[in-house]
């Protein structure tokens, strides 16, 4: 009699859903107030002029304008700001 014993269950086979992080609006792009510019974990990018910081560190536009990325300060931090059009 050809029989096969039941295989043991595997301990793998789990993975978390991707969080879709990253830059959503790039430098020079026009944005409206409220548009999300960057979704991030921690402050990889810091909020500059006319940019708000959400509780999950999301950067969003406070006014309409163009997105500008810049590196400033002694620690070479990356800032995102909005310039009025």
From Swiss-Prot:
GO terms for molecular function: structural constituent of ribosome. Keywords: Ribonucleoprotein, Ribosomal protein. One of its GO terms (biological process) is translation. Residues 1-22 are annotated as: Disordered. The keyword Ribosomal protein applies. Signal peptide: none annotated. GO terms for cellular component: cytosolic large ribosomal subunit. Pfam families: Ribosomal_L27. Belongs to the bacterial ribosomal protein bL27 family. This is Large ribosomal subunit protein bL27. It comes from Vibrio vulnificus (strain YJ016). The lineage of its organism: Bacteria, Pseudomonadati, Pseudomonadota, Gammaproteobacteria, Vibrionales. The gene is rpmA.
